[in-house]
Amino acid sequence: MSNAPSNTPTGFNYKPGHTLYIRNFGTDMRARTLGQAFEKWGRIVRCDIPISSNPQAHRYAFVEFEEREKAELAHEKMRNAKIGNDIIFVEWAKSRERYHRDDKRRLSNYA
């Protein structure tokens, strides 16, 4: 069992600094297609597109690189890249702790 922190509440484990969070792609995007678009920057350990129980939810993905430097390069090069008909957004994946901390900040703005 890995000691790596869980990502967002989906429960994916990953190495911090090695994993990118991808969003803004259509329902026809497949993990294999997304992974192939990123693998030119380095070896990919995993590419996941979680399945939501809510069909209206926006799709997102996690792309994990073997080497941190390759993830940094992909983060720089793939921001606002076009894959098929989609212009994707690329951010660093957050740990579960950071996700919840940021979520609490958002909720506190409404108090």
UniProtKB/Swiss-Prot annotation:
GO biological process, alphabetically ordered: mRNA cis splicing, via spliceosome
Domain RRM: 18-95
Keywords: mRNA processing, mRNA splicing, Nucleus, RNA-binding
Primary location: nucleus
SUPFAM superfamilies per UniProt: RNA-binding domain, RBD (SSF54928)
Keyword ATP-binding on entry: no
GO cellular component annotations of the record: nuclear speck; nucleus
Source taxon at top rank: Eukaryota
Single annotated GO MF: RNA binding
InterPro entries tied to this protein: Nucleotide-bd_a/b_plait_sf, RBD_domain_sf, RRM_dom, SRSF
Localization per record: Nucleus
Glycoprotein among keywords: no
Its biological purpose: Has a role in pre-mRNA splicing where it is involved in spliceosome assembly.
Family: Belongs to the splicing factor SR family.
Protein name: Putative splicing factor C222.18
Organism: Schizosaccharomyces pombe (strain 972 / ATCC 24843) (Fission yeast)
